[in-house]
């Protein structure tokens, strides 16, 4: 007997690991006239350019874009260094193969610059790779009996007449609902932001940009029919040397709004989406305005999206089959599917107080403040996912030191936050991402600064469900003696655990006939009910 089956297209996590490794290079100062005296600040953007999956191994290719802000020995004007390093890392992961799909997200744990001499330095960065290896798995589940099934062999004429193979419309099927989650799309895409900022007239035109820091703020992503809508802001901060000589360093901080959409045929308003967005590449260049002055700032940012779209489906699957006078035996097999347990987002505000290093002079003015989150561990606890790590807050400020007025100070504090995930268990699969949405800093006094940061976390949790499913239905010989010895008419008192399905199958009748004879409006029965059961067939 052939069965109609429905396919569930699933993305299952094969391996989820974090790996720490180092990248080290010896570099030379680009400006041949400069030698580093004092490093003010440094930052990195690490991008994953490609991942190749092999047997028990992945190869990660990436790029490190780093900036150094420093004071040189031969000048009191601040200088900047921007460079790019390509790297390749082979990572052992047992149990994976070339057909699996690996996603790798990079996080900077630490970085250092060790001078070799005035011109050369060793740049060393510690990276943490968040690796998730997935594979596509298709689950076929029986939802109905194929009404075109025919042309089978039977052990006798009675079996042929009652088997339901040439007469499948008389077969009764017992079904149950399962709520499953199918993967609709798993892809990466890019979104480019290109805007111009005008330098206010109160500030001098740009000569040379020595430091730029671009970050995403307040992002909002949603799915629509056939597209993904993206909204957010870019926080732009630069330090520059003016065109005019003998003018002090200047800084500029502005916010750029961006919005747009990406076409994606799988997207609908009701899909379950999990979309990560991060900066992949940034370029900031001064440009001449209509007055022939360097007062325009061209900002170009390439945003990378990792898009996963899921669809929740309620499916009625065959649990049992029966036909009076036939012996139909369902063959069962244990299979695992996944359903959506929860998708949740949470925000928390962190307040950090920072004492200013007085050896750098008194704090006069805060130019810029930033924060970064580094998650070290994720625990499944008390119906929640708990993220534990560090928050690093930094300010760039102007001090009373006339020789080196631009300073930077950072502080690292403990971070812990839970996001509700009702019903989560240790073996459930999940994705969790985090980002800093807003940062601002205020001077409490000349010696202390208060930094407030809003941290957003988003989680999606999948519940693994293992159940028995009908894979095929066999016909076996009918026990003619049992069939003929069963009473044609029977009075019965309902016992605990009885259902109409159970009683019909045991007494060679149908649910419909029991309901008709006993004037039942629905299939609900309870212990103590009295029923009249009439057999529907006889050999």
Model-derived features with residue positions:
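Extracellular LysM carbohydrate-binding repeats and other cell-envelope/extracellular binding modules
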Residues: 509-539
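Membrane-lipid interaction segments
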Residues: 2-486
């Amino acid at each position: 007997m052939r069965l109609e089956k429905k396919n569930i297209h699933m993305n299952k996590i094969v391996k989820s690991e974090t790996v720490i490794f180092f990248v080290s290079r010896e570099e030379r100062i680009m400006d041949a006239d400069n030698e580093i005296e004092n490093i003010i600040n440094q930052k990195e953007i690490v991008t994953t350019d490609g991942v190749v999956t092999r047997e028990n191994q992945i190869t990660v290719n990436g790029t490190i874009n780093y900036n150094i802000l420093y004071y040189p020995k031969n000048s009191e004007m601040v200088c900047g260094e921007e460079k790019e390093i390509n790297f390749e890392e082979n990572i052992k992961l047992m149990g994976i193969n070339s057909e699996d799909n690996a996603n790798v997200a990079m996080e900077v744990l630490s970085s250092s610059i060790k001078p070799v001499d005035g011109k050369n330095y060793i740049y060393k960065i510690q990276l943490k790779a968040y690796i998730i290896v997935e594979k596509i798995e298709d689950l076929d589940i029986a939802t109905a009996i194929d009404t075109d099934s025919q042309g089978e062999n039977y052990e006798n004429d009675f079996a042929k007449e009652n088997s339901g193979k040439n007469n499948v419309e008389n077969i009764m099927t017992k079904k149950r609902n399962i709520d499953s989650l199918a993967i609709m799309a798993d892809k990466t895409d890019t979104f480019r932001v290109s805007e111009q900022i005008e330098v206010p007239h109160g500030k001098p035109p740009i000569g040379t940009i020595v430091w730029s820091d671009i970050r995403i703020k307040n992002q909002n992503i949603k799915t629509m029919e056939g597209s993904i809508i993206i909204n957010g802001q870019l926080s732009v901060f630069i330090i520059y040397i003016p065109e005019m000589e003998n003018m002090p360093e200047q800084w500029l901080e502005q916010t750029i709004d961006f919005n747009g959409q990406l076409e994606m045929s799988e997207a609908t308003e009701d899909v379950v989406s999990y979309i990560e967005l991060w900066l992949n590449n940034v370029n900031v260049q001064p440009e001449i305005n209509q007055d022939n002055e360097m007062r325009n700032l061209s900002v170009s940012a390439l945003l990378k999206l990792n898009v996963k779209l899921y669809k929740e489906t309620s499916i009625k699957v065959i649990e049992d089959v029966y036909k009076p006078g036939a012996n139909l035996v369902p063959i069962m097999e244990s299979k695992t599917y996944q359903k959506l347990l929860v998708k949740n987002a949470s925000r928390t505000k962190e307040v950090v107080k920072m004492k200013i290093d007085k050896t750098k002079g008194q704090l006069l003015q805060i130019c810029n403040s930033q924060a970064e989150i580094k998650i070290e561990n994720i625990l499944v606890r008390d119906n929640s996912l708990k993220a534990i790590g560090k928050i690093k807050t930094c300010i760039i400020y102007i001090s009373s030191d006339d020789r080196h007025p631009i300073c930077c100070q950072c502080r690292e504090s403990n971070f812990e936050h839970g996001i509700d995930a009702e019903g989560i268990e240790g073996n459930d699969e999940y994705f969790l991402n985090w980002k800093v949405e807003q940062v601002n800093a205020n001077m409490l006094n000349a010696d202390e600064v208060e930094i407030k940061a809003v941290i957003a976390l988003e989680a999606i949790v999948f519940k693994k469900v293992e159940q028995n499913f009908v894979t095929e239905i066999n016909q076996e010989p009918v026990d003619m003696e049992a069939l003929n010895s069963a009473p044609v008419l029977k009075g019965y008192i309902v016992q605990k655990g009885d259902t109409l399905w159970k009683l019909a199958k045991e007494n060679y009748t149908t649910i419909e006939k029991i309901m008709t004879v006993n004037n039942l409006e629905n299939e609900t029965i309870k212990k103590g009910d009295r029923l009249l059961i009439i057999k529907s067939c006889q050999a």
